[in-house]
Regions:
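The substrate-binding groove and active-site-proximal loops of carbohydrate-active enzymes
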Residues: 1, 35-48, 98-116, 171-183, ...
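Active-site-adjacent "subsite" loops/lids of carbohydrate-active enzymes
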Residues: 1-2, 65-126, 161-169
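Catalytic domains of carbohydrate-active enzymes, especially glycoside hydrolases
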Residues: 3-30, 124-130, 229-237, 302-311
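Aromatic-lined substrate-binding rim segments of carbohydrate-active enzymes
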Residues: 6-13, 26-77, 86, 170-201, ...
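Aromatic- and acidic-residue-enriched segments that line the glycan-binding/catalytic groove
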Residues: 34-43, 74-98, 135-166
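Aromatic-lined carbohydrate-recognition surfaces of secreted/lumenal glycan-active proteins
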Residues: 65-75, 132-140, 169-221, 269-282, ...
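Substrate-binding cleft/loops of secretory-pathway carbohydrate-active enzymes
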Residues: 141, 200-245, 288-289
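Substrate-binding cleft of secreted/luminal carbohydrate-active enzymes
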Residues: 230-252, 256, 262-341
Length: 341
């Protein structure tokens, strides 16, 4: 363990980067449902008490800012807590979506309280510079159809019937905005719990899918709004991952340029946005493939040429030098001369 940590510390130091998003949770099954974490807490099993140690070592020895990367809704907590339900057109019974993150409903007060406890426990056991809210804070245009959500919609003046909401274009648009704000408000509530323990200096960042940035009207499918993110968080972490979005390899460059152009159209957006590239090509069958270091370096160069100031990648396999540091570090620092080191 110590040797692995030393390898990570040296790699981060050699890269001369400013920030690391450090995962505070474990997902050994790869299904997106968080059953274990890397810090002591009151609700979930602790896989190992290492988050605090690794965060401290990275901050003190590598000089980077650490953002604790935490889920918002995809926690495997008490089975009596309300889960997000979806109600497809023509169906009468709401159910948990079989192909989406299994998420807790943000409209259940008990959910908010228990997730808040996890954030408080993290803040009480580790020092860090910010929080990164995971990409699981989303609701499709068929969600949330759980009982607490329906009650919240009614209290906000919406129809009880999601089908009728969907058939009314104006109400459908307002409903999407309501859900977007509800998710954002929940994350701000969580950040307030962290700041109450660690201090007001804690920064916030949140993952957003690329489509709500490229096509703002797709807020209806995600309950994510780029303009809201820019106002609400210190940083918006855009998942600039073409293959994950089904973009063909030959079209990936143009897709990234389209994304950067959209960012440039919004004042101050590029100063508050971080583009997260993919270092792995995820497959539904689990046979994930590493993206070549040359390709990743090319994408980084492309982002720079299109005016992007802040970017990173995920995942980093530091034990196997993937991606290769001598190929990607020139895209982070001009002080890198590998043949002279």
């Amino acid at each position: 363990m110590d040797r692995n940590i030393d390898v990570l510390i040296q790699r981060v130091k050699d890269m001369q980067i400013s920030t690391v998003y450090l995962q505070a949770f474990a997902d050994p099954d790869g299904d997106g449902l968080v059953k274990e974490v890397w810090f002591p807490n009151r609700l979930l099993p602790m896989k190992a008490d290492i988050f605090s140690r690794v965060a401290w070592q990275l901050r003190t020895r590598s000089g980077v800012n650490i953002y604790a990367w935490m889920p918002v809704l995809s926690w495997d907590l008490d089975p009596t807590l309300t889960r997000v339900k979806y109600l497809p057109t023509g169906e009468k019974k709401a159910q948990i979506h079989p192909e989406q993150y299994h998420r807790l409903s943000p409209f259940d007060d008990r959910v908010r309280a228990q997730v808040g406890m996890l954030y408080e426990d993290l803040a009480g056991h580790a020092a860090f510079d910010g929080i990164l809210f995971h990409d699981d804070a989303l609701l499709s245009d068929y969600e949330d159809a759980s009982a607490p959500a329906i009650t919240a919609y009614q209290q906000a003046g919406f129809n009880r019937s999601l089908s009728e909401i969907r058939q009314n274009p104006e109400q459908f648009k307002q409903w999407a905005r309501f859900k977007s704000r509800a998710l954002t408000d929940f994350t701000l509530e969580l950040s307030a719990r962290v700041k109450a323990i660690r201090g007001p200096h804690i920064k916030t960042a949140r993952n957003i899918f690329a489509l709500p940035v490229i096509q703002p009207e797709s807020e209806a499918w995600f309950a994510q709004n780029y303009a809201d993110f820019l106002k609400s968080y210190d940083w918006t972490a855009i998942m600039a991952m073409p293959y994950m979005e089904g973009v063909a390899e030959k079209s990936a460059d143009q897709w990234l340029i389209q994304l950067t152009n959209q960012i440039k159209n919004i004042p101050q957006a590029k100063d508050k946005s971080i583009l997260e590239l993919q270092a792995q090509n995820w497959q539904k069958n689990g046979q994930h493939q590493a993206i070549s270091s040359q390709q990743l370096a090319h994408w980084m160069s492309l982002l720079q040429l299109n005016g992007v100031k802040n970017y990173g990648y995920y995942p980093d396999n530091f034990l196997h030098n993937q991606p290769e540091i001598d190929l990607i570090r020139p895209e982070y620092s001009t002080a890198w001369y590998p043949k002279n080191d």
